[in-house]
């Protein structure tokens, strides 16, 4: 069971995502960028769904804070369909994006794909570490 942090200030969207994901995953909720960073810093998060426009710290500030510590999957949520802005978030380290209003099947599929890809990378990273020389 993956732990998914949903950072979204709209309580209706939070509830929709919690209902969608909670059957197969543990969902942790944050309603501002500042709260999202705090919950992320508590550890154990496997994936982040991150709104772009948030009170406190906005989505790009939260993304930068996460990328300073981790490479876990981050999927941006946006009501904006500005391709240039979306491209910039992808270049800044987001793994994917979903435009609101979203299709629930698409959200579930994108979350599943990102979690699967993340799980596939972990054994390779462990293997790389094990192959390092013991005495540096």
Role assignments for model-derived ranges:
Residues 113-136:
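Short, Lys/Arg-enriched segments at the junction into DNA-binding effector domains
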Residues 32, 58-61:
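Acidic catalytic/metal-coordinating carboxylates
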Residues 84, 102-115:
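C-terminal output helix
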Residues 51, 78:
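Active-site residues of response regulator receiver
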Residues 29-47:
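Acidic, metal-coordinating helix/loop segments flanking the phosphotransfer/catalytic sites
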Residues 38, 60-72:
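Short amphipathic alpha-helix used as the core "switch/output" element in two-component signaling
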Residues 10-28:
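Two-component/phosphorelay signaling modules centered on CheY-like receiver
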């Amino acid at each position: 069971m993956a732990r998914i942090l949903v950072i979204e200030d709209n309580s209706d969207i939070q509830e929709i995502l919690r209902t969608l994901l909670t059957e197969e995953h543990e969902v942790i909720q944050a309603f501002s960028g500042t709260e999202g960073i705090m919950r992320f810093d508590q550890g154990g998060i496997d994936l982040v769904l991150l709104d772009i426009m948030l009170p406190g710290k906005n989505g790009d500030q939260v993304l930068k804070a996460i990328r300073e510590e981790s490479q876990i999957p981050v999927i941006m949520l946006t009501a904006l369909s500005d391709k240039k802005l979306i491209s910039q978030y992808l270049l800044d380290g987001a793994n994917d994006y979903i435009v609101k209003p979203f299709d629930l099947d698409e959200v579930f599929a994108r979350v599943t794909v990102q979690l699967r890809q993340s799980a596939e990378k972990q054994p390779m990273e462990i293997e790389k570490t094990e192959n390092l020389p013991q005495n540096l």
